[in-house]
C-alpha cells in the first residue's frame, strides 16, 4: 500500500479520514490562502485543495497526498475563518435567516496522477437573536471554522436545514467523494 498523507493539521479532517481505517500521516501545507481577484468561492476552494496537496506531494513524490479546503459563500461573497470573536459575531449576524453555501473541495495527488472532487452543501440558518449568537460563541468559539460554527457540535442548533449529498463535507472533508477518489487511485476501501 502506498504512503498516504493528509495535507492538513486540522483535527476535524484528521478524525474524518481516520474513519476509513487507512494508515496516514499529516503534514502542514504551506499555502497562501488569499483569494485572487474575481475568484469565485468554489474556484477558491478547488484551487486551495489542489495547492495544498501539490505542495506536500512535491516533498513526498512517492506518496498519495490529500488536500482539502472549504469556503463559505453568502450571496456570492466568500467568508473566511473569522479568527476573532467580533468577526464571528458579524458573520453569524449576516448569516442569520440566510442560506449559506459551503464549497468543500478535495484533491488527491499521487505519482503522475491528480484526482479532484467538489461538494456543495447548503445550510439554512434560522433567524438568530443577538443573545443567541453571543451565547453560542461563548459556549463554542468556532474561530477556526468557515462560517463561524461547528456543525458537529452545538452549532447544529443554529440551523433550520442542511442540503447535501455528503454530510461529512460540512465538517471539512467530503468523505464520500474522497473514498471514491482513493478507490480510483487503487486503495482498497473497505
Curated annotation (Swiss-Prot):
A Gene Ontology BP annotation from the UniProt entry: nucleotide metabolic process
Record's catalysed reaction(s): N(7)-methyl-GTP + H2O = N(7)-methyl-GMP + diphosphate + H(+)
E.C. number: 3.6.1.-
Positions marked as site (Important for substrate specificity): 12, 70, 152
UniProt keyword Ribonucleoprotein present: no
An MF annotation (GO) of this entry: nucleoside triphosphate diphosphatase activity
Location(s), subcellular: Cytoplasm
Catalytic site: 69
Cofactor dependency: a divalent metal cation
Chief location of this protein within or outside the cell: cytoplasm
UniProt keyword terms in alphabetical order: Cytoplasm, Hydrolase, Nucleotide metabolism
InterPro entries from the UniProt entry: ITPase-like_fam (IPR029001), Maf-like (IPR003697)
Pfam families: Maf (PF02545)
Chain's role: Nucleoside triphosphate pyrophosphatase that hydrolyzes 7-methyl-GTP (m(7)GTP). May have a dual role in cell division arrest and in preventing the incorporation of modified nucleotides into cellular nucleic acids.
Name listed for the protein in its UniProt record: 7-methyl-GTP pyrophosphatase
Organism in which the protein naturally occurs: Xanthomonas axonopodis pv. citri (strain 306)
